């Protein structure tokens, strides 16, 4: 176990075999479903550009009005922080003229990583909806619980598994093609 993982385990941020119960998770709404459709379109566009196929949309929770969107752009920008969630949250903050996004929902095709989960907390995003779990880097539920950790100054409610199979299939196909040299 690495020092960092050991520290995270002591802080209770590492999942140990059995996932914790998501008691705060509400069901997906029609706005979530519409945003996920768009996030999947964005993810397909990322794949066509040779990027890992992840798409994200931020919308105003009460109205469903879209405020920002993004897809992975790490390769084309040579920017390790150019994740779909970062792009969507930045665009939403610019659109509303405020970094506080309590009134917003982030919909993303893949469970956010630690960097993106930290941004979710710092931007105070109210809800997060994601499709596929990420057992290797997921920081909302799979490996860590950063987005709803009660010790942090903000917690987002989570909805998981929306269009799970579509999101996971897109990733599987992308990495299969990459391994086969396509």
Predicted feature residues:
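Zinc-dependent deaminase
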Residues: 1-46, 112-115, 119-182
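Short, basic and Ser/Thr-rich N-terminal targeting/leader segments
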Residues: 50-54, 102
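Short beta-strand scaffold segments in enzyme catalytic cores
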Residues: 54-60
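Glycine-biased flexible loop/turn sites that connect beta-strands or occur in inter-domain linkers
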Residues: 63-64
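A structural microfeature
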Residues: 67-68
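A short, polar/charged loop-to-alpha-helix boundary motif
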Residues: 76-86
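Glycine-rich oxoanion-binding loops at beta->alpha junctions
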Residues: 86-93
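Immediate flanking context of iron-sulfur cluster ligation sites
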Residues: 98-110
């Amino acid at each position: 176990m690495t020092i960092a993982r050991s520290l995270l385990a002591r802080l209770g941020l590492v999942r140990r075999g059995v996932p914790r119960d998501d008691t705060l998770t509400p069901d997906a709404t029609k706005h979530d479903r519409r945003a996920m459709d768009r996030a999947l379109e964005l993810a397909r566009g990322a794949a066509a550009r040779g990027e890992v196929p992840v798409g994200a949309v931020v919308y105003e929770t009460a109205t469903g009005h879209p405020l920002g969107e993004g897809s992975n752009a790490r390769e084309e920008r040579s920017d390790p922080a150019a994740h779909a969630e970062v792009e969507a949250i930045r665009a939403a903050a610019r659109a509303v003229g405020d970094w506080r996004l309590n009134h917003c929902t982030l919909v993303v095709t893949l469970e956010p990583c630690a960097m993106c989960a930290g941004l979710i907390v710092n931007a105070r995003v109210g809800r997060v909806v994601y499709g596929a779990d990420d057992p290797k880097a997921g920081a909302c539920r799979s490996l860590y619980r950063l987005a709803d950790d009660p010790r942090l100054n903000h917690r987002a409610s989570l909805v998981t598994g929306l269009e799970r199979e579509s999101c996971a299939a897109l990733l599987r196909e992308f990495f299969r093609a990459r391994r086969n040299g396509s």
